[in-house]
Amino acid sequence: MKIDILTLFPEMFYGPLNSSILKKAQEKGIITINYINIRDFTTDRHHQADDKPYGGGAGMVMKVEPIIKAYEAIPKNNSFTIMLSPQGRKFNQKLARELSQKEHLIFICGHYEGIDERVRQLIVDEEISIGDYILTGGEIAAMVIIDAVARLVPGVLGDEVSAEEESFSDQLLEYPHYTRPRNFRGLEVPEVLLSGNHKKIDLWRKKQSLLNTLFRRRDLLKVRGLTKEEKILLWQGFFELAMLIDEIPERSE
């Protein structure tokens, strides 16, 4: 199995992924792990890989261009790209088994406030979360997944051992993040984030957060519940989706 890790902090991986079972697996050639520093694919002299979010708000957002350039520089063969995200599929042993069947895994580790939404749209096959809590970045989550998956790759534990025996804010998922450029490969930043109208921006973000949670982690809403105003926002979101569907021409069978 080949594993490529896109990160701003490759040094975080050197100890955990180069010791014990994982070290032996790499020495045997069963697993190959490469660390790609996203800053190496920036174009400015300061190697800036993040920028202020469109629409305002706290924190910085990781830029789309250096991540895509780093991704495109990786030789690929049946690759499967994972972005570590609190709004992703919950990681468990079943998912670890699925991933252990892949030939090539690519991990994208977020940091700061988040990653430009267009990264997910362009290259991500699966978003994965390791739990309902907040970490500084995706690096530790990637280590958890890599460790769990590697143990299931044939030959890693040895024939004598059977592997089979062996942030949330307000309980809602986050809204999509965007930063410069405004247009990337035809994917535009939502117009409302460029309006300067902070009331509209706040409503859009709350609506997207509610829709994200409903579609991806409905179990959180069942525990949390919804206010009357939040239900209205969701219905508005459904209406907007219906309008988009109506704009698509019918296809003759």
From Swiss-Prot:
Binding, S-adenosyl-L-methionine: G110, I130, G131, D132, Y133, I134, L135
Pfam families attached to this UniProt entry: tRNA_m1G_MT
Family the UniProt entry places it in: Belongs to the RNA methyltransferase TrmD family.
Top-level taxon: Bacteria
Classification via InterPro entries: Alpha/beta_knot_MTases, tRNA_m1G_MeTrfase_C_sf, tRNA_m1G_MeTrfase_TrmD, tRNA_m1G_MTases_N, tRNA_MeTrfase_TRMD/TRM10
GO molecular function, one term: tRNA (guanine(37)-N1)-methyltransferase activity
A GO BP annotation: tRNA N1-guanine methylation
Encoding gene (name): trmD
Main location per the UniProt record: cytoplasm
Subunit structure: Homodimer.
Keyword field: Cytoplasm, Methyltransferase, S-adenosyl-L-methionine, Transferase, tRNA processing
Protein name, as recorded: tRNA (guanine-N(1)-)-methyltransferase
EC assignment: 2.1.1.228
PANTHER family per UniProt: TRNA (GUANINE-N(1)-)-METHYLTRANSFERASE (PTHR46417:SF1)
Localization per Swiss-Prot or TrEMBL: Cytoplasm
Enzyme class: transferase
Signal recorded as keyword: no
HAMAP family linked to this entry: TrmD
Reactions this protein catalyses: guanosine(37) in tRNA + S-adenosyl-L-methionine = N(1)-methylguanosine(37) in tRNA + S-adenosyl-L-homocysteine + H(+)
GO terms under cellular component: cytosol
Function text: Specifically methylates guanosine-37 in various tRNAs.
